[in-house]
Structure formats: structure tokens, C-alpha cells
């Protein structure tokens, strides 16, 4: 069974389990997208219009604690599926201010967790701690990993985003992220880069239709894992369904 079918069947089976649970504690989602961009960089070789099927499940009891999992196909040397696990706590300070913090694990269960970079076998899997605060449509957050993707050492991700409804079923959003590495392993002579995204989402026909423009300031093969196409600006279209 190919990787798209495997992920799809798994999501459908888990979706059946979700339907049998209490609606206020367990939920799910599935997305079909033209690309999988993570912090501005495509996780699918060649970048651009490379289809991704993604989905996840969240357990959120009334206490504010939560657990979840999320998966997507990827396409690079050393992995074709990403499976993530996360957990944390979120709550409100008042009617307009809320916060969230937790732990996120990024796993690549296939192909021995190895990424072949210049004939070196490097561990793909890593984890992050994260925290954010939200108020009046603005979110400010930071993620930190002591040993980031492919053993690149200390890494921090600082970001700001804003979203608002401009009509009953239309939401627009903007995001800016600053990626800071401890080592200059994959980014040429630099140890940081920026990514940004603007998007518009419309709810209709039981799904959410989203069009986003995603970009980074990485503009050469040397700065972007040997393939600048992975980091070039692109439009990403997706269809999402809540389960």
C-alpha cells in the first residue's frame, strides 16, 4: 500500500474512533494540501506542487491539559512519513488573554531515522518545548529544541502571528517566524533565517478552503539543504475537514 493510502486509511479508522467518543474531549482533522511547508521550507522534495495528506487527533479534557498526534507524508532522503506527538496545558487569564505551553516530538518512523547529508547519517527525530500567549487575535510564541532536526544542535523559533475574521466564514492571517540555529550546518554561512506566510480561509461545503503565500529569505542551494526550490516562495492551497 502506498504512503498516501496508508495515511488515509489510518485517518479514516481513527476517525471512526473519534465519532464514538465524547465530542467535548476528542476531535480530529484531515487536510489535503498542494505542499507541506514547515517554517517556510518544503518537506517534499522539489517543493512547489507536491501533494500532502495530513491529519491528527486531539484529546482536550476540561482541565486544560491536552494530548495529540499528527501525521503527514514527507519526501526527503531518510523518511517518507512524519508522525508527531505532543502534550501541554492551555488556559485563559481573562476574556481576551490566553496562554499555552507544552512539549512536541517530531518522529520519522521509516528508513531508520537517518538523513543522508554529505554521506553522513544523521538522526531526523527531535523534540521541542513551546510556549505562547494570545490576545485580541495576536499570538506571540517561542519553541526551543536542544538538538534540532538532523542533529543541528540548539535551535529556537520565535514567531508572531495575527488572524481575524473579515466576514462570517472568512478568516485572514499573517505569520512571521525567526529561526535561530546553534550551528551553520545546512544554511551556508548563516545560522538563522526568516519565514513568513499570509493566508485566507473560507468555510464552505463542510470543509475549510485555504490559500496561503509562503516564503523565506533563503535564496540559494547552499542555504537550503542543497535545493533552493525547497525554500522559494510559493502558493499553497489546502482543503481541511474537522472530524
What is the predicted role of each segment?
Residues 117-188, 213:
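Detector for outer-membrane/organellar transmembrane beta-barrel domains
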Residues 24, 47-53, 79-83, 123-129, ...:
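Residues that define the transmembrane beta-barrel architecture of outer-membrane proteins
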Residues 136, 198-208, 213, 229-243:
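Outer-membrane beta-barrel "beta-signal"
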Residues 30-34, 69-73, 101-105, 133, ...:
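Transmembrane beta-barrel strands of outer-membrane/channel proteins
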Residues 22-75:
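Short glycine/proline- and aromatic-enriched beta-strand/turn motifs that initiate or cap beta-hairpins
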Residues 59-61, 89-91, 105, 133-135, ...:
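Residue-level signature of outer-membrane beta-barrel architecture
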